[in-house]
């Protein structure tokens, strides 16, 4: 196989597959070269990196993710594509960022592969999954569906709401552990937890 291969698919998302025989420096350089060559297309998106079982030090990975996001506005993940929307036939998938000033209204589940920029809004009656950073507003379960949930890699929102419940934004804390945030309603209150490897950390 080639040392690195890039694949993009609306159902499976955008991913980079890595030859596990490469060392970390080679992997870093190849990913950067791949992103540079497609920067215009990829900016504001999220990419799943498949290391095919190769063990990567978490501190190296987190430092690299931060570097890529700051330079190119691209969020890398090696965990998140374990998530699946249960009925893909009833899900809307948006590839690329939701830009400022845009309003997106969806009846079914929504998967956004990219950022939700400030000044934009998402209104969705079911679950919202954002493989990127939320800076705008999200209202899930707008028809009083308090079973709806929101997932995002990063949260710096203007507003988060599920059904009639609004998240207290002061609850959002930046942590090094976990790969994203779950937002859901429990006992009449919007709760927020970090997500890590298939479980929510309270």
Curated annotation (Swiss-Prot):
Q: Which organism is it from?
A: Dictyoglomus turgidum (strain DSM 6724 / Z-1310)
Q: Name one GO biological process term.
A: cell morphogenesis
Per the record, the similarity remark reads: Belongs to the MinC family.
Q: List the InterPro entries.
A: CAP/MinC_C, MinC, MinC_C_sf, MinC_N, Septum_form_inhib_MinC_C
Function (record text): Cell division inhibitor that blocks the formation of polar Z ring septums. Rapidly oscillates between the poles of the cell to destabilize FtsZ filaments that have formed before they mature into polar Z rings. Prevents FtsZ polymerization.
What PANTHER family does this protein's entry cite? Answer: SEPTUM SITE-DETERMINING PROTEIN MINC (PTHR34108:SF1)
What name does this protein carry? Probable septum site-determining protein MinC
Specify the domain of life of the species encoding this protein: Bacteria
Q: Which residues form the signal peptide?
A: none
Could you tell me the gene encoding this protein? minC
Q: Does the keyword Lyase apply?
A: no
Q: Alphabetically list the UniProt keywords.
A: Cell cycle, Cell division, Septation
Q: Which Pfam families match?
A: MinC_C (PF03775), MinC_N (PF05209)
Subunit structure of this entry? Interacts with MinD and FtsZ.
Does the UniProt entry include the keyword Cell cycle? yes
